[in-house]
Design a protein with these regions (language model features):
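Residues immediately within or flanking Cys/His clusters that coordinate Zn2+
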Residues: 146-151, 167, 172, 178
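Short, cationic motifs built from Arg/Lys/His that form the positively charged side of catalytic pockets
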Residues: 80-83, 87, 167-168, 178, ...
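Short linker/helix segments within small regulatory modules
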Residues: 160-167
Length: 201
């Protein structure tokens, strides 16, 4: 996956979250969504390509880039665990991360800006970048706008841009209508038969 190819979020047709929070959104959207797109963390090859592209897009990495590396099966386990941990955090669940302490660095740019930059190499650097962006989003009050679609088969990560932060679907027409239709059918079944069911043929 190159920088010009769609991100894990872009392949779903979902708008990217602002600034570095997009990195967190992209991690969450690496999963298989209803069998429509593959899990990008399913193999070492796909995970390695995806990680390189993601870190190259990250604001703290744009000046120097990142050398390619080959993640191991153990690295894949760590990346999937990281994805589960961030997902649990968005669900409001207790999180027991594999790495309770993650390193990051404060970098001063020539222009005088101070940035929180990821530390380490490979998957460790990616984990550092993810938690750094979660921290920054929590500090600037944008974390509450990153959500998982309430349609369980989807669960895509999206950034809620509504004024009152009331969005629950990544796309109302796609997932909102589908869930409402299922709920309507369930209510009708509970009260009797659906239209056209149980009638003489």
């Amino acid at each position: 996956m190159s920088q010009t190819e769609p991100t894990s979020t872009g392949r779903l047709g979902i708008a990217a979250a602002p600034a570095g929070l997009r990195l967190v959104q992209d991690l969450l959207n690496t999963r298989d969504v209803g069998g429509k797109v593959p899990d990008l963390l399913a193999s070492t090859d796909s995970a390695g390509d995806w990680l390189i592209a993601e870190l190259a897009r990250h604001p703290a990495e744009t000046s120097g880039g990142v050398d390619r590396f080959d993640p191991t099966e153990a690295d894949l386990d760590d990346l999937r665990a990281l994805r589960r941990e961030v997902s649990a955090l968005l669900h409001g669940e207790d999180v027991a991360p594999r790495e309770p302490a993650v390193s990051a660095s404060l970098v001063i740019t020539p222009g005088g800006d101070v940035r929180l930059a990821p530390a380490g190499t490979g998957p460790q650097r990616f984990s550092s970048a993810i938690w750094a962006e979660v921290f920054l989003a929590q500090q600037n009050d944008t974390w509450r706008r990153l959500k998982l679609c309430r349609n369980a088969p989807c669960s895509s990560a999206f950034y809620d841009r509504s004024k009152n932060n009331s969005g629950v679907w990544h796309d109302v027409k796609v997932c909102g209508n589908a869930v409402n239709l299922r709920a309507s059918r369930a209510r009708r079944r509970a009260g009797g038969t659906l239209p056209g069911e149980g009638q003489p043929r």
